[in-house]
Amino acid sequence: MSFNLEALGVWTEPKRFTVEPERIAAYAAATNDPIAEHRRGELAPPVFAVLPAFDSGAEAVLAVAPAELLMMLVHGEQDFFYHRPITPGMELSTRSAPVGVRQTSAGVVVAVRSETRTAGGDLVNEQWMSTFFRGAQGQRSAGESAPGHATAEAVRGTDTVGEAKQHVDADQTVRYAEPSGDHNPIHLDEDFARSVGLPGIINHGLCTMAFASHAVIGIAEADPRTLKRLAVRFAKPVPPGQDISTRIWRSGAGAYAFETASETEAVVLKDGLAVFEP
């Protein structure tokens, strides 16, 4: 069950995506987004950027990963670099490539890079997705890793600038699946989730990331159009129906580090980073 290292660096064919206001509004509603422009479908939320990259990113993972390991896949990290906001009417094109495979003591990490452009070729955003294959062993590491975004201990030792408490609804995963296009049964089928070693269905990691983005934008009192980077590491799953709490530190000019914990105080998002135009 070796990973296909020959696929590293090979781009997928571009995938087209039309940005519709209804899809923006549906995504905002599915993530309990409090920002009015998002709810009205006038401006895409930050994590909405993953939707145009969903198909090409999955294709890039499948190019390197053995099919028999796919049910052991979990989302490890996500990192967005924003060059311009996504708004209704945009015709977008996204391509993705697997760029690295890394063996760890607990499994194998596959790093995928995606880039989304307008119909005219202008760069809209770049993304790095790290997927983790639990329990996979015996793989040679190759290629590159995604950019780092770890929270420095010196930053963690400072006072927080704020903390936001939010609630993940009992039906959150069902509501998120349709507008996101992510129907992975670990988020929808209790029996299936348990069969692959999870405690039950879990919230989509990107949905939890969207919650954290609302928290950071609100506490920073920032215009979401000025967001330049948003990154997290998915540390632990969040069951639906739980409260979560996001603590935020200032880490530089326009930059904030953040960490999200569940109601059991387990850290679910770590090494969070949000960078706004100063």
Placement of each model-derived feature along the sequence:
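HotDog/MaoC-like acyl-thioester-processing domains
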Residues: 1-6, 73-164, 238-241, 247-278
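Catalytic-pocket segment enriched in acidic/His residues
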Residues: 187, 191-253, 258-266
